A protein has these predicted regions:
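N-terminal amphipathic alpha-helix/helix-capping segment at the start of soluble metabolic enzymes
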Residues: 1-15, 22
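Conserved, mostly hydrophobic/aromatic
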Residues: 16, 36, 114
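Anaerobic metallocofactor- and corrinoid-dependent redox/one-carbon enzyme cores
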Residues: 26-30
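A short, Lys/Arg-enriched amphipathic alpha-helix followed by its capping loop at the start of a domain
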Residues: 32-41
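Conserved functional loop/turn residues at catalytic and ligand-binding sites
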Residues: 40, 110, 166
Length: 171
């Protein structure tokens, strides 16, 4: 991991999707992207990448590469998605199915970063996935959840593991 200056990530659509099932009107998404660009926000997390659900969820619940490709994204914005580590680690699907759903990025790809939400016991399994994504020129981040429930020694141990990986961001 490299030490860099402070970066701002906006996750309004991803986080706000809990209120409307990630079903934002296209016009709102594009106006939002223009506003983020005008505000000089560099990183925008458009939504999650979930497996298909039995209930209706809007496009920002799946944030497929094909959906992102249809958006008018200002040049300086870096677009990303969030993936819950449990969705890929606890799923009984084959590795090829998981790769197809979660990591099927075209060569010319508008998604430039993936942020994983992880519990401490998931991090060592997600780091190799981050390393693979880095080979595709995708910036990777791990968000350590429920950190207040973790001992200082465990935080130190997992931080060293992250620091010795190709992971770009760990917090």
């Amino acid at each position: 991991m490299k030490k860099n200056k402070l970066k701002i990530l906006d996750c309004t659509l991803r986080d706000g999707g809990y209120y409307n099932n990630w079903d934002f009107p296209r016009e709102l998404i594009e106006e939002y992207l223009q506003a983020m660009s005008a505000a000089k926000i560099e990183y925008v997390e458009l939504g999650f990448r979930f497996f298909k659900k039995d209930i209706y969820l809007g496009p920002c619940a799946y944030t497929t590469s094909s959906f992102v490709e249809t958006l008018n994204i200002p040049k300086k914005l870096k677009i990303g998605i969030m993936i819950n580590a449990k969705d890929i680690l606890s799923n009984k699907l084959s590795k090829s199915k998981i790769k197809k759903v979660f990591f099927n990025f075209p060569k010319k790809n508008k998604i430039s970063f993936v942020r994983f939400a992880c519990h401490i016991n998931e991090i060592s399994k997600i780091i190799p996935i981050c390393n693979e994504l880095n080979k595709q020129k995708i910036t990777t981040a791990i968000n350590l959840m429920q950190i207040s429930e973790i001992s200082d020694s465990e935080i130190e141990r997992i931080s060293k593991l992250a620091a010795n990986s190709k992971l770009d961001i760990f917090y």
